[in-house]
């Protein structure tokens, strides 16, 4: 399976880019192997939904914590989404 994003390493973090052309069907529920902190660099209207919670609008500059092995997914917004990811 091909990932619906592109990663670029930038020192101690990576920039993950989701194209505006990504299909909503590719943005599946999943779990990560490590704890992560993310923040939005670019994008509007995208949402993060954690397991058993309502979707939350992603706000540029706000820090979001994602615990390892916790189910979550992105919900597509408008345009491209770029997030900065720190693995813990």
Predicted features, each with a name:
Residues 13-33, 65-68:
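Conserved short histidine dyad/triad with adjacent acidic residue
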Residues 51-70:
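Short acidic-glycine-tyrosine-enriched beta hairpin
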Residues 28-29, 34-35, 60, 70-75:
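A structural signal for the main folded, soluble domain(s) of proteins
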Residues 67-88:
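Ligand-binding loop in jelly-roll beta-barrel domains
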Residues 31-47:
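Short, conserved beta-strand element in jelly-roll/cupin
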Residues 3-18, 82-88:
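Double-stranded beta-helix
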Residues 23, 44-46, 71-72:
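Short Gly/Pro-enriched loop/turn and capping motifs at secondary-structure junctions
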Residues 49-52, 77:
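Short strand-coil-strand connectors
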């Amino acid at each position: 399976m091909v990932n619906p994003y592109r990663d670029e390493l930038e020192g101690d973090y990576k920039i993950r880019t989701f194209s505006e052309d990504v299909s909503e069907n590719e943005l599946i529920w999943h779990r990560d192997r490590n704890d992560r902190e993310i923040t939005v660099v670019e994008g509007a209207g995208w949402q993060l939904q954690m397991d058993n919670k309502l979707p939350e609008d992603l706000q540029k500059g706000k820090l979001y914590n994602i615990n390892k092995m916790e189910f979550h997914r992105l919900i597509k917004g408008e345009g491209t989404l770029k997030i900065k990811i720190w693995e813990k």
